[in-house]
Amino acid sequence: MTTSTRGAHRTPAVLVLEDGRIFRGRAYGAVGATFGEAVFSTGMTGYQETLTDPSYHRQVVVMTAPHVGNTGINDEDMESRRIWVSGYVVRDPARVPSNWRSTRSLDQELAAQGVVGISGIDTRALTRHLRERGAMRVGIFSGNALPDEGTMLAEVRQTPEMSGADLSAEVATTEAYVVPAIGEKKFTVAAVDLGIKGMTPHRMAERGIEVHVLPATATVDDVYAVEPDGVFFSNGPGDPATADHPVSVMQGVLERGTPLFGICFGNQILGRALGFGTFKLKYGHRGINQPVQDRTTGKVEVTAHNHGFAVDAPLDQVSDTPYGRAEVSHVCLNDNVVEGLQLLDRPAFSVQYHPEAAAGPHDAAYLFDRFVNLMEGQRA
């Protein structure tokens, strides 16, 4: 529920966690009430890309950077058609942006899209609380006549948890569309949209790939109707344990031996397709400064992450799967979480992080080239 935003920055707001911890501040964006899973992002920049990343659907994002909104909002850096976060939490927002590309303030954009936020709270204390207690349900309430604390806490505890949530179909396209190759067309890729970011097909298009973006409900027949040279499974929100349909489609692709690449949720789908389990991380990886090691080369990359679940695969051995041998290709150096998988007997691999770098470092851009190399090898 959201209401008017006029004078919102003077309106009281309360953030209520499901364990009873309460933070008081001022409204930011729309005024009203919102609910979701409280998570924190450590990125110092890229807030516009974060807000419009469909993987954040049904999450209330806490920004650890103290100043947010300095460069306003523009029409070029959107990663999807709308803001997907359920709520937004900042310490010290910039009310007057300063950037030559800015067309409006972040506050105005949040208000226009009905996103309830809160400002002026101790985001460092909140982040530490989430790090120690784990991601949890949360509510943001703002207005001049707020309910009592007991009522607000009861409302938070009635909201659904992220575990068991099947959300891809809520954010994915409902109609297939094509992103044309930039320059000479070299390959055709079928991209299954589980919550795809706009920069991902663009990175492929830069490499001469015509990308056919398909709904999350696409079947194996739909995938092969576009006569793809490769198949891609995107990022997306929710619990991978619920994603039985994408897993089935990926297994059909693996059976045919078509080159396959997955990112983020796509990595978890590959893990499940190979017979591995998935699990929920305590507080997840979200930000643009996460160190990951490529175990093939030993190289360490600084990467962009947004995931609250991970694949449960052995780090110290090659695993036998229905599609041949598989191994963990990348690990996070902070906590040894699986950050990539690759098949040794078929042209298929995936990573848990975001090589499209929107926002974030470009250390992992080579993964798109690796996908191209797999498709070239299949033609040879």
Swiss-Prot record:
CDD domains registered for this protein in UniProt: GATase1_CPSase (cd01744)
Pathway: Amino-acid biosynthesis; L-arginine biosynthesis; carbamoyl phosphate from bicarbonate: step 1/1; Pyrimidine metabolism; UMP biosynthesis via de novo pathway; (S)-dihydroorotate from bicarbonate: step 1/3
Active-site residues (renumbered): C264 (nucleophile), H354, E356
GO molecular function terms noted in the UniProt entry: ATP binding; carbamoyl-phosphate synthase (glutamine-hydrolyzing) activity; glutaminase activity
Catalysed reactions, semicolon-separated: hydrogencarbonate + L-glutamine + 2 ATP + H2O = carbamoyl phosphate + L-glutamate + 2 ADP + phosphate + 2 H(+)
Pfam families: CPSase_sm_chain, GATase
Entry-linked PROSITE patterns: GATASE_TYPE_1 (PS51273)
Family, as annotated: Belongs to the CarA family.
Subunit organization: Composed of two chains; the small (or glutamine) chain promotes the hydrolysis of glutamine to ammonia, which is used by the large (or ammonia) chain to synthesize carbamoyl phosphate. Tetramer of heterodimers (alpha,beta)4.
The name this protein goes by in its record: Carbamoyl phosphate synthase small chain
